[in-house]
């Protein structure tokens, strides 16, 4: 039986990123949760955009969550869903925008699944 689902917004609708670079969300504490079930959407981009669902024990060293898709890109004007297993205390989403004159509009939201006792 799955644990209770708690809504989470990692990047608000409609976040616009301008210029090549790495954009990270604020880390959220997820020690009471076992999975992150996230949906991402992006509009057409100038350049390339990839999302990374990452976790950390100390908010300094980050690693890709188990089960997360590396270089996750749902595609232009498309929504994609991914589930990541949570094993560490902190969760964030990192967006990497690349290319000359790069810009993108996107969002990432979903649910955190509570651990069962």
Predicted regions and their residues:
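Solvent-exposed serine/threonine-rich low-complexity stretches and specific carbohydrate-binding patches
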Residues: 11-16, 64-74
């Amino acid at each position: 039986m799955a644990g209770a689902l708690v809504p989470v917004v990692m990047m608000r609708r409609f976040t616009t990123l301008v210029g090549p670079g790495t954009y990270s969300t604020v880390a959220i504490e997820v020690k009471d949760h076992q999975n992150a079930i996230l949906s991402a959407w992006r509009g057409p981009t100038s350049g390339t955009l990839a999302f990374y669902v990452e976790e950390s024990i100390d908010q300094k060293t980050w690693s890709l969550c188990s089960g997360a898709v590396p270089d996750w890109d749902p595609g232009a004007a498309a929504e994609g869903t991914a589930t990541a297993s949570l094993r560490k205390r902190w969760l964030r989403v990192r967006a990497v925008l690349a290319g000359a004159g790069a810009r993108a509009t996107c969002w990432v939201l979903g649910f955190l699944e509570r651990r069962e006792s």
